[in-house]
Amino acid sequence: FFFKQKTAYEISECDWSSDVCSSDLAECRQVDLAPQKQKLDAEKGAAYQDGVKKLRALIAEGELFQANLSHEMSGKFKGNARELYVSLRDGQPTELSCYWEDQGGRSLISHSPESFLNVNGAEIFSRPIKGTAHREQDAQLDAKAAAQLNANEKEIAELNMIVDMTRNDLGRIATVGQVAVEDVGSVVSYPTLHHREAIIRARWRPQTGLAKLIAATFPPASISGAPKVRALQAIAEIEQRSRGAYCGSLGYWLPSASPHGEFSVLIRTACIAKGTLRLAVGAGIVWDSDPQAEWEETLLKGRYLRDK
């Protein structure tokens, strides 16, 4: 784990409470960001592309099949973090959007579309994402972009690797023979992007417990790589920074004989602290990755916030 154990919510039967009430968010006034717009300074594209080349070299040597490489954009932030969350939520609605803050004034603003784990009693599913295309305003061009993404052999192969990893991770805690790929990959459209997503389902024994479930599956396959341990080592060597909350997970857990919980993958997640906003973005790197194209994909993923 990348965190210290700490109580985030107080849970009693079906009631829950936190320091941030949903009613508070709903009542926030719509923020006008134009006067406070700050340019996010990205790392130089050349440095990121050099990292892509290093990963391709490791792939050529047989050490890796795939790895997720990220970089971080940052800028000064003036305003109210909750208001920014509400403003972005209206333009980027996703089921797993969330706002979190601690007593020290640090905030997470997440508009992640990716489900890491969804648990309902003995049923578990995971919905990894790999493959991205920009949405077009013209309906015909937009449909063409989605079709091209769906037929892109590189993106298909990349998602297939992540599906296999996720299936293997869930197999560590699932009942024998109870892991299945429900959807090997379909294009799902969001307000600004198309993504390719898969669905893997498993049955498990709930008495196994949350700690063992997380230990078997974390970090998510889609933001690490294959094989996972070597990919994480390579990522740390190349990125030379802590990812913090980015690519971690945020969710809730209702313990019982038939537990329920849901955890997102913290992508599309901005971190705000001490007047600075940080947004990390990444792309999956495989042998046939083009460094320039991967760099441009990361910028595309951060566009929803940079254009705000």
Which residues are covered by each model-predicted region?
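Short, exposed "boundary/linker" segments that immediately precede the start
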Residues: 3-11, 15
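Extended alpha-helical targeting/anchoring segments
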Residues: 12, 18, 23-308
